């Protein structure tokens, strides 16, 4: 007869800091941990060996850890009511921000579409896409709600006019590493005076032009996946996986901006702020376009005057919840980026309905 295996505090043989197996580890069906979840339980083999986790209070107050740099935090669904921006009854589109997305090289209309639609679905008031001319027809059909402005070559004055128009800027998705893309990124980073999200090829260009790091501001958000992060910080993906918190916090100390380091467990941080560890989302989201959706969501939240650090944490959490909603419908194999877009509306519809009901009670 198989026994039910219960671990106390953390399964023997697991690192409480990293989740690594230290030789041989106990595989539990349940783990009863004391006071607070250990950070290592969220990573590595620990996710498989902890089993169902129960946190038992032993009288330790969270305030004991105030000010400690090695303490992280997470969100759960109940936090949404305090995180989502209010929607005023008498609002117009101008209240929710003008987004400029500099995205999509020739043939990469999909990246532009996913970013722009995600910004709209997350609540942005108006989205303008600045993209290669070859993408214009596709985007006008895919997303008629967006303003489509195009380029055939780099035009500095035109770009500066668009940057002046916008309340928030997102750049990088599907942008390529072309000379035109490099000029677009360089001018944006040097000239933008608004919150700015930099993703994908924007990060790859940034990693090769270290002088641009000096131009990053506290209003910028960088959203690298692990390979892009390796290019930015100079450590291999293997090193980042093995000592993610050390190298993540080391990188945060080099920039004034927010960093969203994307992985199965995404980290969000800013120098001097606690690190957020995301626990929403699932393996079905490992598909092309999912990162473009996240970039658009974060930009859409910035447009609603959410501060960059909070826009990063909330955007990542909502993105994961949208992926969880998509997985329930499509399973672990068949989820596409477009399904994650549908999941955004599902998550926010459920939450807004609850908010309306609370207001009426």
Model regions: which residues?
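Internal gly/pro-rich beta-alpha loop/helix module
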Residues: 1-70
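Small-residue (G/A/S/T)-rich helix-start motifs and N-terminal tracts that mark the onset
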Residues: 41-196, 204-221, 226-361
């Amino acid at each position: 007869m198989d026994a039910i295996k219960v671990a106390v505090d953390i399964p023997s043989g697991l690192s409480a800091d990293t989740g690594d197996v230290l030789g041989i580890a106990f595989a539990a069906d349940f783990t009863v941990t004391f006071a607070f979840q250990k950070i290592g339980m969220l990573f590595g083999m620990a996710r498989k060996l902890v089993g169902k986790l129960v946190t038992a209070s032993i009288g330790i107050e969270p305030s004991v850890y105030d000010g400690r740099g090695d303490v992280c935090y997470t969100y759960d669904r109940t936090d949404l009511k305090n995180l989502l921006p209010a929607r005023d009854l008498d609002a117009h589109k101008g209240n929710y921000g003008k987004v400029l997305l500099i995205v999509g090289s020739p043939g990469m209309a999909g990246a532009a579409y996913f970013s722009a639609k995600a910004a709209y679905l997350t609540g942005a008031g108006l989205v303008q896409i600045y993209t290669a001319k070859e993408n214009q027809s596709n985007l006008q059909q895919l997303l008629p709600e967006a303003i489509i402005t195009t380029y055939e070559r780099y035009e500095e004055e035109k770009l500066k006019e668009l940057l002046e128009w916008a309340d928030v800027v997102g750049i990088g998705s599907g942008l390529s590493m072309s000379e035109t893309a490099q000029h677009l990124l360089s001018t944006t980073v040097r000239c933008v005076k608004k919150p700015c999200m930099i993703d994908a090829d924007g990060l790859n260009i940034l990693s090769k032009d270290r002088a641009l790091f000096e131009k990053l501001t506290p209003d910028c958000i960088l959203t690298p996946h692990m390979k892009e992060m390796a290019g930015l910080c100079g450590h291999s993906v293997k090193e980042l996986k093995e000592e993610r918190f050390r190298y993540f916090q080391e990188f945060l100390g080099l920039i004034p901006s927010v960093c969203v380091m994307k992985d199965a467990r995404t980290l969000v941080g800013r120098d001097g702020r606690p690190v957020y560890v995301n626990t929403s989302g699932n393996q079905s989201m490992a598909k092309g376009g999912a990162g473009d959706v996240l970039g658009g969501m974060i930009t859409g939240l910035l447009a609603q005057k959410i501060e960059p650090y909070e826009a990063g944490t909330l955007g990542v959490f909502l993105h994961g919840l949208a992926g969880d909603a998509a997985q329930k419908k499509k399973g672990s194999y068949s989820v596409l980026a477009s399904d994650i877009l549908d999941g955004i509306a599902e998550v926010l519809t459920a939450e807004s309905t609850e908010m309306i009901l609370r207001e009426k009670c």
